[in-house]
UniProtKB/Swiss-Prot annotation:
The system is composed of three essential subunits: KdpA, KdpB and KdpC. It comes from Bacillus anthracis (strain CDC 684 / NRRL 3495). The keyword Chaperone does not apply. Belongs to the cation transport ATPase (P-type) (TC 3.A.3) family. Type IA subfamily. It comes from the Bacteria. This is Potassium-transporting ATPase ATP-binding subunit. GO terms for molecular function: ATP binding; ATP hydrolysis activity; magnesium ion binding; P-type potassium transmembrane transporter activity.
Amino acid sequence: MMRPVVVKEKRVNESHIHAVEDEVRQAKTMDRDIVKHAMKQSVAKLNPKVMIKNPIMFVVEIGFVITFILSFLPSHSSSIPGWFNITVSLILLFTVLFANFAEALAEGRGKAQADSLKQSKKDVFANVVKENGEIVQVSATDLRKDDVVIVKQGEMIPSDGEVIKGLASVDESAITGESAPVIKEAGGDFCSVTGGTMVVSDEITIVITSNPGKSFIDKMISLVEGAARQKTPNEIALNTVLTSLTLIFLIVVVTLPIFTNYLGFQIDTAVLVALLVCLIPTTIGGLLSAIGIAGMDRVTKFNVLAMSGKAVEAAGDINTIILDKTGTITFGNRMAHTLLPVGNETIEQVGKWAAISSVLDETPEGRSVIEYVQAKSISYNRELAEQGEFIPFKAETRMSGVDLQDGMKVRKGAVGSVIEWVRSQGGTIPKDVNQKADFISKEGGTPLVVAVDNRIYGLIYLKDTVKPGMRERFEQLRQMGIKTVMCTGDNPLTAATIAKEAGVDEFVAECKPEDKIAVIKAEQDKGKLVAMTGDGTNDAPALAQADVGLAMNSGTTAAKEAANMIDLDSNPTKIIEVVGIGKQLLMTRGALTTFSIANDIAKYFAIIPAMFTLAIPQMEALNIMKLTSPLSAILSALLFNAVIIPLLIPLAMKGIAYKPMSSNALLGRNLLIYGLGGVIVPFIGIKVIDIIVGLFI
């Protein structure tokens, strides 16, 4: 009896295994294609017009050309065999090719992502609503900004837009990778839709917000392909320093023959070129572009779209993070937990008016009030509310409700706002309102006051919970020297309770949109870089003001245009990971720069004795590695200089291991690993290569 079940399970498992194997096979095939393309591009990039963009590697390429030409000319030095020049030129050629390969490999990963995005741009047609109401079918490429389009179940959304009518489930897996459909509806902060996604239920009317070539997917393709990539300020500054070092060493090498002639001996041109290449920071010069491209690639793989490399770098330098409480620190599903009447009112009266104020309220909180009242079997007149005029919640008023046909006004909202509203109606405030509001706040809940005209009936106790692990994450940020500030519309007591439970450093209670800008500016005035998340139109000014603004893909077009990063998963807590990726990018660049410059110490001890020992025997004392011969020493240093670039490509692409700790601790750790390591590794590497080279010369 059990045998068929076992067989079925086995088949299911085998099917799953085959699916996984197919995915692995496809990934390996794609990686092979990327490597093949990178190998071709590494040769194509030898074009001087391309190479001159990287001055360090351009100097190496010139060195290759010089030594290659010299290999066909008669040698004037009896100590330099004929094969030496061609060997040096080949090593220099591979040094340049390895650097080009690193950059092409990083670019290739971006192009692979771009190709998958291009597949989502299918040739679709749109049902455009003309001004006279006529519906005309046109190609998506003919759509223009402000066109009105109807999209039905099973149809592809033709271009970016905002829902102006209806409600529908939309499959955004082509963009976000998330298979679960999301709800899009007119009004609010979840009205934005993206071209290339599909309506899986119902029907919506949208207004197009972008012209052809300017859509969200077009921007993504441009960014991941690198077409829009520009060097960041830090990258330009480092490149300037490295180029200056190269120029200094070039002057030293060019003037060196003057001094050697004075001392009575000459140095072969190929040896001078080898000295120059070993002195200049070729390792970081060859990997610098790859590090920057790979940094943006890591952010993209994390399902975050960075509008520029500058945004990623800025994330690594962040000092303060502004976080919304709801949805970021807490789950955001505040549900009606209980009702508390005030004065001589009854729980039935509170429930009745709370329900009437929530009938037309489609927010999770509003629906939870209706569910709670129904669960408690409290009666209320639903038709009375449906016939009234709904007053939606606004950040400025901090309350919502309904104006009934008989003139009565029902409101629910923040304690201070409703009390002020009741007083403006000429009402009096029950003594126990603030007492019960404080009780709810101390419990970590959110109190909403229910009032009708000039009379307060009671409070709704909304309960929310802090996401697990938030305290630990904030502690990690604290270790990195990053301050966290929680912004919430809750009253100070509720905000203080949540802030203490979550472990944030500071909080701003009863926060309005303009207050966020004030907080950001206050931090920036102290010389700090600020990051924040947001999804609504009212968040747009603050997102634009912040140094790193992370907008949610589910949010409004205004928010996404104001931000310099967009989270395709619409997960506000991801700002913490984005900061980590930014720090990893900066650390990787700094660590490999340290390693590259530290390498020079070992190269000095290899090449300097090799150049001068014949003329100045005392220089042999510097040959602490006991290298086989002068020629072997020069070739070993050059070979190590070339080979170290491809060996470090995985580290440049993946980024160095990152652990949350203070800046001083990170500096000490990286100096120990990459500074001291940069000194020791080449000593070992050059010696091993010398032993191998010594077998052939």
